[in-house]
Design a protein with these regions (language model features):
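Short, charged beta-turn/beta-strand-edge "cap" motif at the junction between a beta-strand
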Residues: 54-56, 100-108
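Active-site scaffold segments
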Residues: 30-32, 96, 101-102, 113-119
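A structural signal for short beta-strand/turn segments enriched in small hydrophobics and glycine
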Residues: 46-48, 91-103
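Zn2+-dependent peptidoglycan hydrolase active-site motif and core
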Residues: 28, 42-87, 112-118
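Conserved beta-strand positions that form and line the central face of beta-propeller blades
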Residues: 32, 69, 79, 102, ...
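A residue-level detector for short acidic-glycine micro-motifs
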Residues: 17, 35, 50, 82-85, ...
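Short glycine/threonine/proline-enriched tight-turn/helix- or strand-capping micro-motif at secondary-structure
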Residues: 11-44, 53
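Acidic, glycine-rich catalytic/binding loops that coordinate metals and/or anionic ligands
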Residues: 1-9, 14, 34, 39-40, ...
Length: 180
């Protein structure tokens, strides 16, 4: 059985921590997922109400690294965290299935993943609910077959890699190296 969802275009998803506890028993306020292509997409449409840029700390709100909080209306919000970079601004509109970021290791993390939270009844962690209800996947550690259900949103191209060996140096680097 493949779970219909809009958070990855991969055909499998790995959940490394569920809600409300880690496999080790500690409190965990969301669900952590790892996607084969490391790209994350919006589970539900809404408006960005927080767009945090990681400042290098692993405590407080910075523990989520680069993250967004999206209002779904009616006192319902979702959070997606630990992105490699921040690409959103407060007030931006996000559609279900929109690319929201590349999974990263910003904030307090033990590996590359996206941390998802779902808040119902108000804004903030005290309103946490099981995010599996909006993610479309089970709440439990494991690897699951998934099927894309997010429409035809375009996938961004992969960022350019390093120059090929033997390639030309940028002119500024050539001059910098020649001054030594």
């Amino acid at each position: 059985m493949a779970y219909k969802q809009s958070i990855t275009k991969s055909d499998t998803i790995r959940e490394t921590a569920g809600y409300p506890t880690y496999p080790s028993g500690g409190v965990h306020g969301g669900i952590d997922t790892v996607h084969t292509d490391y790209k994350a997409y919006a589970p539900v449409a809404g408006t960005v109400v927080t767009a945090h840029i990681w400042e290098g700390s692993n405590t407080g709100v910075d523990s989520w690294g680069n993250y967004i909080v999206v209002s779904m209306g009616g006192d319902k919000y979702w959070l997606a965290a630990h992105f490699a970079t921040q690409r959103w601004n407060v007030g931006d509109t996000i559609a279900k299935g929109d690319f929201i970021g590349t999974q990263g290791q910003s904030g307090n993390v033990t590996g590359t993943h996206t941390h998802w939270e779902y808040w119902v009844g108000g804004f903030g962690t005290r309103y946490r609910q099981d995010p599996s209800t909006i993610l479309g996947i089970p709440n439990g550690v494991g690897t699951y077959a998934v099927e894309w259900d997010g429409g035809d949103t375009p996938t961004p191209p992969d960022p350019p890699g390093p120059p090929a060996p033997g390639g030309k140096l940028p002119i500024w680097l050539y001059f910098k190296l020649s001054r030594r």
